[in-house]
């Protein structure tokens, strides 16, 4: 394995880079040389692994299913994984290794004081009280099927008091500064551990599961089957 260099990719947000680094360290421990490509944009990373510019990277089952494979929504984690694994092998010659129980799902986060004031615990509650709530998100939030347009198909129209667009990294700051009351969140966001913000219950199960999966080029697994075990 000493003469094999494995190129590990990651998307440009922190959780993806941390996962990529965990893969890299595990492979280095096993005696492989590793190159790290940790700033790949979301829309290029799949093509990069298909083209062999990288050998593996961490992905999420829900992203694979909806965005890459353009398949219909599925809420069962195992069905989602099985579909992705099968179709990746068939279409892209990519191997999807075992999924991780950790799931970085999509959700909506609110200022805790505002949620309490209006008795909002779930996304259905939010929809019923939307006219009192200032909502903010990225441009993707307002355009993508796994954003507001899709939410409205499941929950009905959200007649928000106002809608603001800003960069993803500023969303919790915008809530803390009292500019907005509700923003899209990842269920693993560190800010949700504070008392200031709450995650709303996706009571109609709109979002699919987002379990972490290592996506690997099949050629690499064929040449080095032990990589799958590491």
Model-predicted segments: where are they?
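Short, well-ordered beta-strand elements
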Residues: 2-15, 23, 32-37, 131-137
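A conserved helix-loop-strand patch within extracytoplasmic ligand-binding domains
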Residues: 77-135, 218-221
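Ligand-binding cleft/hinge of the Venus flytrap
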Residues: 23-30, 123-161
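Ligand-binding "clamshell"
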Residues: 68-97, 179, 191-205
């Amino acid at each position: 394995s000493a003469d094999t260099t494995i190129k590990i990719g990651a998307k440009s947000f922190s959780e993806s880079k941390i996962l990529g680094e965990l893969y890299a360290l595990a492979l280095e421990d096993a005696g492989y040389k590793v190159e790290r490509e940790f700033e790949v944009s979301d829309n290029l990373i799949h093509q990069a692994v298909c083209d062999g510019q990288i050998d593996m990277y961490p992905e999420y089952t829900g992203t694979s299913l909806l965005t890459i494979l353009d398949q219909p929504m599925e809420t069962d984690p195992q069905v989602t994984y099985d579909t992705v694994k099968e179709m990746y092998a068939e279409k892209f010659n990519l191997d999807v290794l075992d999924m991780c129980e950790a799931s970085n799902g999509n959700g909506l986060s609110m200022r805790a004081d505002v949620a309490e004031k209006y008795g909002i615990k779930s996304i259905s509650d939010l929809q019923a009280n939307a006219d009192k709530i200032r909502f903010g998100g990225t441009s993707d939030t307002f355009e993508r099927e796994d954003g507001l347009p899709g939410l409205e198909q499941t929950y009905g129209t959200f007649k928000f008091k106002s809608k603001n667009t800003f960069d993803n990294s500023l969303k919790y700051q915008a809530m803390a500064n009292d500019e907005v009351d509700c923003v899209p969140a990842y269920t693993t966001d560190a800010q949700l551990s504070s008392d200031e913000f709450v995650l709303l219950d996706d009571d109609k199960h709109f979002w699919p599961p987002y379990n972490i999966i290592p996506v690997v080029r099949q050629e690499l697994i064929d040449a080095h089957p032990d990589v799958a075990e590491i």
